[in-house]
Amino acid sequence: VIPTAEHHDGFALYDSKLTRWDAKDMGPKRDLIGDLAKAVRRQGIKFGVSNHRMEHWDFMYPTAATEHDLYDPEYADFYGPPQKPDKNKASAMGPSAEEVMEGKEAPQDQGFLEEWLARCQEIIDKYQPDILWFDNGINSRSLDPLKLRLAAYYYNRAAQWDKPVSLSTKHDAYLYGTITDYERQGRAPKDITSHYWQVDEPIGNKFGYIEGLQIQSSSQIISKLVENISRNGNLCLNISPKADGTIPENQQEVLRQIGHWMKINGEAVYGTHAWMVYG
């Protein structure tokens, strides 16, 4: 189970000492990540954390609107300085191949980058995640020194905890040794690979919950899981809970059906790897 600790908006869903904008101090007044971690681990399930904070840098764009608080100093510690896209720098959403080759600098300032690292370290120390998953935004080569510090911190902590952990990122953020993630099944490798990878796939036609969300059938999801495993990959299935945290019944039913299939066929899934052919 891999909840999002912080999405692009910059609001932490955990008890953070590095920002006042967190779920423990506002809104539900709960450490949502901590509570979920305890519940998941009580069931003997691995627990990971997803962090999208790097994309917060240019999530809030300047606007001509007059009735908003984007420029209010009271909220500067939440929004940060509004950013305009800079065509001369690698995008925070991920540089092009040409930008990587040219070694253009990251658009974020050093203060933001150090804060990003500190928040990652806070999440690592508080929740000891079995997997640390990152969305877009960290695959610029200019961020390699920072990412090296993060990986060293995480792996050294894991050695102290005496347990294996994994990093998962999109594109070639870490080049080798981590789990490459592909967003949606259509981007998955078509052949057996030498490296391990996974697909993050929504249970419906959207990642977040909306009224009338179109849900995939359990057979569709199982087919994608088996396809991926046969090619040395995995499937990270995104669930879309409502605003109150409840999982709609139609999603629950699909999960139960997948669970029933796994009870029968799990031996061919867990602890296995790709063979010489796939299909």
Where are these regions (language model features)?
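Mature catalytic domains of secreted/periplasmic carbohydrate-active enzymes
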Residues: V1-G279
